[in-house]
Amino acid sequence: MGKRHEFTEPNWDIIQGGMGVAVSDYRLAGATGRTAAGMFSGTAIAEVLSRRLQDGDPTGEMREALATFPNQAIADRALIMYFQENGERPDDQRLWYRMMPMFNHNTKETSITADMAVLGAHAETYLAKQRAGATGIVGMNLLTELDRPNMHELLGAMMAGVDFVGMGAGIPDQIPRVIHDIRHGAGVPVGHNVHVRGKGDTAYEMMLNPERYAPDYAEMSDPAFLAIITHHVLAQRLSRNEYAPDGYVIEAPTAGGHNAPARGRDLNERGEPIYGERDIPDLQKMQDTGLTYWLAGSRASNEDYMDAILQGARGVQVGTAFALTQESGWDPELKQQVLNTISREEGLDVYTDTLASPTGFPLKIGRVPRTMAERAIYEVRERICDLGYLRQAHNDPDRPGKIEYVCPSEPIDDYLRKKTGLSKDEIADIVALRESTADGDLSLLLKDASIEDLTKTHIRKFLIAEGQTEGRIH
């Protein structure tokens, strides 16, 4: 397909990055979208809408947005199920929010889970566009890794006129085709393959019937698609697809949030991945192929912007700086605490943790006191899988043809059993071995000639389940 978007508007000089769950929300995206390209986070957007309604929707904006949804029967059902006048709460904090059913491979088109994903993205887009104004540019950020609700969120955002979609945390090779099918399919059901891990990797197809939500396709936007990547090789590969991205955001390893794994195996003394020459994208090759791209990661100054332009970029993407603004959805007290820490002489200690994220991607951690960056606070947090957005579908080894879900926040014994396929006794043996090693480093035992091969196999499975990538296990 030919090039669909030229990105000539001055707003495209700066893209405000999508962050977290409602950190970059409609307020921030609407404010930045007036003069830049504002992007809100679509991550868990159904849950965001649900909780705002259960908090009593104090500004009235959620109900305002829902009143614009084309199918009012769907909007009314959401209000009946989740809106709480004045945000009234029971005494038991565990019962503060009514939980939605989780997205599964068998989630029906008519389920409240699917409806809330469409409604949430529609509401967030509508409110951001209202704030950005007629000439503003507003986009939605999605994560490839959180694949089950993405198709429904795309539909909701497109119904409300979203201008672009940015997507990383994986290889988003299906999404340009999904956007095309939603926009030009005239109500024909749209499919999207979801990966099922385990022996004999397979996929199942999530289905979406746009006509249930959007009977009038004339009002549907045709957003630009930006793939968020780290290397020119992936850009070249994606650009050869029939439905290719319209542009690319190239993130350096210094970018906040998740990073791509380093191509080398070495770690520094803090356990951080060491990025080398092989991790540096060849921007000349991007220019030679005529691809439009933005640079991201430590690009928040005017000098950084000018340097990006000299390297052939259309502009820059900036995230963390916007997370600290008044308009971001970050908790105000935590935001101020981070700002206070940054302002001190020693600054904020930020490091790249290879194990912290259940996605398997390295993750930036800021050592902020009294948060889960402190091990003691993390350890006392109850492990419960009540949201399930990061669950992974696995082929059940004990029930051929069946799918089970592995949730990184479920009780650790259940998680390790599902992820490794080991028995409780085998897991207990590995835990005992860990306690006997220096610094609890199981990977040292993989080089120990006295350890049986079968035990080493179990250790590898255990380490992979805990989050270490196979490439780092020697």
Where are the predicted features?
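Conserved active-site-proximal phosphate/metal-binding subdomains
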Residues: 245, 253-292, 300-303, 310-474
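Active-site entrance/lid segments in N-terminal catalytic domains of soluble metabolic enzymes
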Residues: 1-288, 303, 461-471
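Hydrophobic residues within well-ordered alpha-helices
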Residues: 32, 308-309
